[in-house]
Amino acid sequence: SGYDLAKDIGSGLAKAAVAIEVDGKQQDLHDSIEKDSTVSIITIDSEAGLEIMRHTLTAQVLARALKNIYPKSSLAIGPTIDNGFYYDIETNESISIDDLNRIENEMHKIIKTKSSITKKFKSKKEALSIFKSLNEPYKQIIINEAEQKEDFQLYYQDDDKFVAVSYTHLTLPTNGE
């Protein structure tokens, strides 16, 4: 895996690594490197590494915090922007500026649990079924409108109750490395 490669080079690099680029394609740090390839290790201090970290915070941590606090909400998109990230959601409850501290505290609580984040590949049909069962209509729209031919990357936190569909994330195996 990219993590193993970084670890072989040095423990400092392994700690700073967030993803890899294999033959020009960004991949999760714990993905296998299947063949002889040109591999770059993406670190947290790079622009690409910062974007991956922000995307993980929005797609996994912020989204889960929002679902914990507003369980009947529907998640739309959670992109990164120049100086951070945000998440579009639909909820019947009002969210005020005062709620931001509560949301941030919930994010810190989620981070402290050190949940594992794993990637699973699912067909379009399977992904639609998963998001239908989670009552996530916007995720279903995103998947339906996607023109990709390959399977979708779905990211699960350890209890498999929270799923994000996305691109490269920080992945945390169950052993916490």
Identify the role of each PLM range.
Residues 31-34, 38-51, 65, 74-80, ...:
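Auxiliary tRNA-acceptor-end handling modules of aminoacyl-tRNA synthetases
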Residues 6, 59, 87:
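Divalent metal-coordination and catalytic microenvironments
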Residues 169, 174-177:
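Single conserved hydrophobic/aromatic residue that forms the stacking wall/gate
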Residues 2-10:
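Short amphipathic, charge-patterned alpha-helical segments
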Residues 1-2, 27:
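Metal-dependent phosphohydrolase cores
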Residues 10-19:
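Short, basic/aromatic beta-hairpin or loop at an interaction surface
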Residues 18-30:
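Short acidic beta-strand-loop surface patches of small beta-rich interaction domains
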Residues 9, 51-67:
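Active/ligand-binding-proximal structured segments within catalytic/core domains
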